[in-house]
Amino acid sequence: MNDSQNCLRQREENSHLNPGNDFGHHQGAECTINHNNMPHRNAYTESTNDTEAKSIVMCDDPNAYQISYTNNEPAGDGAIETTSILLSQPLPLRSNVMSVLVGIFVAVGGFLFGYDTGLINSITDMPYVKTYIAPNHSYFTTSQIAILVSFLSLGTFFGALIAPYISDSYGRKPTIMFSTAVIFSIGNSLQVASGGLVLLIVGRVISGIGIGIISAVVPLYQAEAAQKNLRGAIISSYQWAITIGLLVSSAVSQGTHSKNGPSSYRIPIGLQYVWSSILAVGMIFLPESPRYYVLKDELNKAAKSLSFLRGLPIEDPRLLEELVEIKATYDYEASFGPSTLLDCFKTSENRPKQILRIFTGIAIQAFQQASGINFIFYYGVNFFNNTGVDNSYLVSFISYAVNVAFSIPGMYLVDRIGRRPVLLAGGVIMAIANLVIAIVGVSEGKTVVASKIMIAFICLFIAAFSATWGGVVWVVSAELYPLGVRSKCTAICAAANWLVNFTCALITPYIVDVGSHTSSMGPKIFFIWGGLNVVAVIVVYFAVYETRGLTLEEIDELFRKAPNSVISSKWNKKIRKRCLAFPISQQIEMKTNIKNAGKLDNNNSPIVQDDSHNIIDVDGFLENQIQSNDHMIAADKGSGSLVNIIDTAPLTSTEFKPVEHPPVNYVDLGNGLGLNTYNRGPPSIISDSTDEFYEENDSSYYNNNTERNGANSVNTYMAQLINSSSTTSNDTSFSPSHNSNARTSSNWTSDLASKHSQYTSPQ
């Protein structure tokens, strides 16, 4: 008796299963995993009745096994159905820890922004500052307040515009360090040393340049480093840090505003050295953006950076697939030539709907600043004083605390619900709150009841802003754009933010204050903010695409495929579904690694789902939930543990489908590391397939054509990669395992293409 028969007999005795040694539907006696031939370790057949049988083929590789379902009863035309599923044990789980820690740490740049913004609100109301810094030694005039507050934003506007030239030339990481340790610190030193209004303004302009660079590069760095399922929350942490900075500045200023000396303003300003030093020194230990390395064709460094950020070994197939996807998309875009600042405003084949994308980013940044939020944070203390509110400092502090608290649910909602719903809901609530404040302020005047109502709705407005527009705007404006122009577009959006900020800060005192050459609108200004909120909601509805859950590269495909923003959520789901609905006959990861596959009616998470099969982990699955045409099986992984599988597919067919062990597409990156490309090619490469099926939302298109389309996409990518990679990498820090010499980019891509051809050629 051979080993296989012994194995079968033992399994019959232990498992009370009917042994079977007829695997006629299995082609050959070996299974192929990553093209290494391995004999069967054991096999058995479980017969549930006379017409159905379920066969499991175990391989000597403990990480893989194949399950097949066979209907022994011929259909009407004599056909027999066999469904084959090749499963593997879970790959090592990705670690989100480093991506989260890196994203939150660089958000300290937002803390600097918020701290400096909130500081000026308190400093201009300090008794010592009014007496010794104000030119007339008693108070600041409307024009002086306007210049002192707004000129920080003037500096940030120019800082944001120069940011892409520095970050694309020297990297995201050095740019953040330089702007923090050098530019911002110089401006801060001038503010600390100032004994008059002029030097204080000059210092704020220079500090503003540093903050402007930070505001353009930090969200960009966060977007390029984060995993797609965490990107929204991580970028939103930038806004959360801004709110914390505002709160801390208010607390510090309350502690020093009554001091009768220069320390009243120098202490809160000087503390900015601490925050800037933390960011500058900490950046030394963080990796550069992997997409920047791809931009510079330093692929080995990009792989190392991804390894650090994803918590995966450098040879992990998921990490390498992500690297290939980034490289493919960038090379496709770069094949159209170098990009300039004007390309940010040009739609082309490699940058679909680019005009709409840049308009969207600029518009939402502008409406964020014109929402009324900075009026409260810049002039809140003075406004509360003028409307009869007692202890305006305390009310201002409470508003900052609300801002911090409600930024936290916003970090959750942006990835859970999506960008569009959050922006739309937030805009509506903000509009209502602003209009109520205006109506109450105009109709009731300076009464106690009116003050309480206004404070309550101001807090409601701040809560809505913090949870929605505060963070989501930075998320959208950082992720909308192709890699070739991403830094430039992000900088333009940040510059738009600061330009509107500057304009609002400059003109608001003239609109609100009472006196000559002013409009004396008072609470009526909230009618303006409320009206702008309504316009913002309309713009979001018709311009903002839903990008939740997509990689930065898949967002390009979204804009290429989705005809408009209104139905972009539908197309977003299509793209995400296509990424998961690859043929079930190919290698798949277990449910621990596929968390976004969706839910069935019974609320069990499927491993993979398509129109024909729902392969579900049924650990703990209630027996009464199994339908009559469902088939359940327990697969032994060889270590004593079982994986419970249920297949809801009917076991009849009109054509014979023999079980095959399909080859897993295997790509060698030229450094001895393998990559499974089983599900799809790089998304930005235009597929050879027709789009009619895609546009008709026929899910069978994905199921039946994914393998073919994936191969076409990857093959197209390989050809483009070879043609476009004429430059060489200067990186010699990484030596491939099979070659001690550093390889050029062309060698790297040649190996990639040749290995791909080797493993995807007809067998």
From Swiss-Prot:
Entry-linked InterPro entries: MFS_dom, MFS_sugar_transport-like, MFS_Sugar_Transporters, MFS_trans_sf, Sugar/inositol_transpt, Sugar_transporter_CS
Residues in the Extracellular compartment per record: 121-144, 197, 253-266, 379-393, 443-452, 513-524
Biased composition (Low complexity): 725-737
Main location: membrane
Residues spanning the membrane: 100-120, 145-165, 176-196, 198-218, 232-252, 267-287, 358-378, 394-414, 422-442, 453-473, 492-512, 525-545
Membrane topology (Cytoplasmic): 1-99, 166-175, 219-231, 288-357, 415-421, 474-491, 546-763
Region of interest called Disordered, as start-end residue ranges on this chain: 1-28, 725-763
Name by which UniProt lists this protein: High glucose sensor RGT2
Taxonomic source organism: Saccharomyces cerevisiae (strain ATCC 204508 / S288c) (Baker's yeast)
Lineage: Eukaryota, Fungi, Dikarya, Ascomycota, Saccharomycotina
